[in-house]
Amino acid sequence: MGTPFECGVPIVVFSSQKRAMHTPENMKTHRVDGHTSRLSLESRRLTGQAGQIAQAARALYEKKGVAKTTVKDIAAEAGVTRELVYYYFHGKKEITRAVLDDYIEDLVESAMVWNENREFGKTRQSLRACVQAFRRSLYDAAGNERPMIRVIEELGVRDAFDVRAVRETVNALDACVASEYAQFHKVEIEMVYEMFCVVIFGMVGLVKLNPAITDEELMKVVEQTLHLDMEPIHQDRPL
C-alpha cells in the first residue's frame, strides 16, 4: 500500500545535507537596487534539471497526492528518465524533501518580494501590503488553503513544517527588515527575533480561528505587538 512514509520512517521537513538549510550562518544577502539601506536574500530554490524534477513532483503531489505518486510518474511529468531522477535524488523521500524545501522557499520569497517592493518610510502602507502577502501565501482569493497545506498534512509534518517556515521567514525578516527599521526608528521592544516569531505564529493561528478577520485588524495586532512607529518618514536622499 502506497505511503509517504518509507520503511516506516517519516519524511522529515528539514533539508538533506546536500542542500543547506536557511540559517543566519549561510543566508546570502544582497543590496536591493535603488536602496542604500535595504537587504534581500538570494534565492535557494533548486534550478536546472533537479529543480525541474522537484517541480514535477510538487505538481503531482498537489494533484493526486503523495502516496499515489511514484518516481516513474515524476520522471514522466518532468520529461526525463527515471535514471536521471535517481542521478539527482536517492529516491522519493529525498524528492519529497526537495518539495518541502520549495514550499519553504515560496514563503521566504513572498516575504522578500514584499520587502523589496515596499516604499521606504510608509510604514502603514507597507504593513498593509505585508498582511496581504501573508494571506496570499496561505490562501487563495476565495479563502481556500493553498495546495501545499494538503501535501504537508498528508505527510503528517504540519507542526514541524510550521516551525521551520516561521524560523526561516523570521531569519529573513530579522536580517533584511528589522535591521533597516532599526536604522530609522526607535525599537520599542526587546527580544525582537522572538517577537517576530510570536507575530507570525499568532497570525497563522488567528486566521484559522477567525477566517473573517480583516486586514486592518491583523495590521493592528502586528502594530501593537511589535510597538511599531507608524509615522511616515520623509527622507531627501534615496534609500
What is the role of each PLM region?
Residues K28, V66, F89, V151-D159:
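Short helix-capping/turn signature of helix-turn-helix
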Residues M112, R158-K186, E190-E194, K220:
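Amphipathic alpha-helical packing segments from all-alpha helical-bundle domains
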Residues D101-V108:
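Short, basic, alpha-helical segments at the C-terminal edge of helix-turn-helix-like DNA-binding modules
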Residues Q52, A56, L60-E94, A98:
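Helix-turn-helix
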Residues M1-G48, H234-L239:
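N-terminal intrinsically disordered/low-complexity leader segments
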Residues A129, R136-A175:
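Short secondary-structure transition hinges
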Residues E6, P10-S15, N26, V187-L209, ...:
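Hydrophobic alpha-helical segments that form the core
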Residues A98, M112-G143, F196:
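Hydrophobic alpha-helical connector segments
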